Curated annotation (Swiss-Prot):
Organism: Amphibalanus amphitrite (Striped barnacle)
Gene3D superfamilies: Rhodopsin 7-helix transmembrane proteins
Protein name: Probable G-protein coupled receptor No9
Glycosylated residues in this chain: 13, 17
Domain of life: Eukaryota
Principal place of residence: membrane
Amino acid sequence: MEGPPLSPAPADNVTLNVSCGRPATLFDWADHRLISLLALAFLNLMVVAGNLLVVMAVFVHSKLRTVTNLFIVSLACADLLVGMLVLPFSATLEVLDVWLYGDVWCSVWLAVDVWMCTSSILNLCAISLDRYLAVSQPISYPSLMSTRRAKQLIAAVWVLSFVICFPPLVGWNDRPGTLIGSRGSSACRLTCELTNERGYVIYSALGSFFLPSTVMLFFYGRIYRTAVSTTRAIAQGFRTTKEDEEGRLTLRIHRGRSVTQRAEQAAAGGARAHGQVRLTLSEPGARRQNKPSFVVHCREDSRAKNQYEIYTVVEGDSRPGRRVPQPQRPAKKLSSASQSSEDDSRPPRFISRVSRRNVRHQARRFRMETKAAKTVGIIVGLFILCWLPFFVCYLVRGFCADCVPPLLFSVFFWLGYCNSAVNPCVYALCSRDFRFAFSSILCKCVCRRGAMERRFRRTLLVGNRSQTEEDCEVAD
């Protein structure tokens, strides 16, 4: 069904001829309609401009090209498509209270609406998984969530979102069309609404919101537990590194003041840095005097970057103060010590690998990952806050069509759309990198516009001078 033509209208109202008994008066230009139109147009502009700025920031600034920001770009693309393909038609329908674009585009528009909103929340699920891996497994995170796997996960998100929005296009709906009323009546009008078919309402509500929200809350619960335990471990100075049925292995780190001072002096003077770190391995149930304990002396060679000369002083050895030299090797993460002694109570003879990064660096990295998780947590919380009222009403309306007032449903409907404009604001407030990228892009645009205006004015000025000189020559 093609969009019906608009007929000439008086100044105070608009009419639409839909081949009914007589033209139906749709609305008059009341103040509240004009205010609604301006507000919805401003919201649409915010959605498009904000999310376009996010995409540009990630692609322009190399510092923002991280795995996590791939999911952020995917989320911004979904919100950007909402602003470009959904909101203009939603605003028209909201203000005019009539659908002007035909039955085919009505079906496509509804499907795109569900597709983009579903992809937004599934992208948030992927982001919560990414943050959980980054906080809980920081060492193996780069291999677990590589760029290739992130792109595969993003593709799966968009395909699954399309699976949820596709059924109404092939007939799983109860929508008879865009025409309400009979053509012989003077009250008939065109509309485009979501289906109330109970089966699809349950299917789409669970797949688009409730199940993904449960998954996100689960991951953020685990992130919170991991953050609390890691913060406590940093404060107490030990960390459980292995746990099984036989027991757990605890690594205690004693870092003296002299180690840091010597390292800083060596870094400033370019000399060799000598450091000492005491490590204690303990198991539950073992007596205190049997704890394996040893001291690692690290000497950094300034001539060979990232190289350590390692000596291990074994406490409790029959030859006190014995040094076991180890060859120089690139600094790597701390691994379990080799133990070749027949007695389990004897300390390890050497450490196979010693990390160059100290506890302070690990704590700083953990704080960065936790801050990123907090930012994404705010985004998830705002998403649930904006969309939960709508999906509750949407689910209730599938069982009782008259139980939800149209005005309330419309308010919650647009509250969900507001979420697409909120995310860029969260990035600007919570992320220094995004804030810097936004400001630099906007400054470039403003400066470029100013340069173009100055060039245009200069061209006009030169042209006016030339014209004046020609006029003077003619007069002479």
